[in-house]
Amino acid sequence: MNKLFETKQLTVLSRLQTSAKNLSGLLAVVAVLCTVSCSDTDQPGPQLNIDTTLGQAVFAAPGDAANAFALALRNGDSEMLSKVLGANYREVLPLDAVDGEDINNFNKAWEKSNDLLPQGEHKVLITIGEGDWTLPIPISEGESGWYFDVEEGRERMRIRRIGRNELAAMQAVLAYYDGQMEYAQADRNGNGMLEYAQKFISSPGERDGLFWEVGDSDKPSPLGPLMGNLSPGGGYHGYFYRILKAQGENARGGAYSYMLGDKMRVGFALIAWPEEYGESGVMSFMVSHAGIVYEQNLGPDGVEITEEIPSYNPGEGWLAAKEVSGPTIN
């Protein structure tokens, strides 16, 4: 795997940093959207009726469940939260990862708009704010009353995480495309040639990668400011990335190398795959200088499969991603 990551991972995608950070911040605190009640939390909290089979409180109506949840959060009452959501509530409600400013921001959003969104006859979701953000933990109706379905909430959070990471990955490969197109517009290393970068991060004092250090008044490198906490062998938003230096027979124009001597001048490509299949992502992605993002579900063996992919070759199973696309080259 060390060879696989010789070019390091794409952890310097600054043009995605702000949007991806906001996305991850929203999802990190989406579980604490209800820091005020679904009605008047100044009223005394409801008496909790514990269902011994579920191991948590059940309620006569979904609004009562929401009120109890909100009251517990507002008071920082971990004991009440453990009754409302169950003893393992921290698995879906990571309070230690949320600061007071985040909670205040969501309090304001809640005050602007909040509702219970029906999901059929026996389930509702709490929505908040003008954008109708939803708490991923549904309130479901069981035999003894309404309760927070933490098990389903955990699965909903997993799906959200995958969706968020896959969107970031698609944006990342397009950021790579944009960066390479910009990089090749000038002679970056003084050798008199226009070429594409063969790695993400430049060698110290050089401009042989898509990122290099710049001064305050200098134009940013193609991938912009360096993201913090670089980790060798690490991924970016749940995905690994590798630069490809050739293409196969299924690519537009047929099979050929992107290299002329030791310079990558003919084209470029990139492949991205999940760090942990089914948890950080499902789909793998590829892009080349043609500007089309392809995707495929490589399954649980995706890491091993990508290790064996020597070139950009979107053949059987690879489909053009509909969510994003770059300018195409005819």
Which residues does each predicted region cover?
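N-terminal secretory signal peptides that target proteins for export/translocation
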Residues: M1-A20
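C-terminal motif of bacterial Sec signal peptides marking the signal peptidase cleavage site
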Residues: L33-S37
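Short, low-complexity N-terminal intrinsically disordered segments enriched in polar/charged residues
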Residues: D42-L71, G153-D178, E182
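Short, well-ordered alpha-helical segments enriched in acidic and aromatic residues
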Residues: D77-N88, L194-A197
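Surface-exposed, charged secondary-structure patches
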Residues: Y89-L135, L230-H237, R242-N250, A255-M264
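Short beta-strand edge/turn micro-motifs at domain boundaries
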Residues: V124-L167, Q171-L174, I292-Q296
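Flexible, glycine-rich surface segments
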Residues: Y183-E279
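C-terminal soluble interaction/assembly domains
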Residues: A269-E316, I329
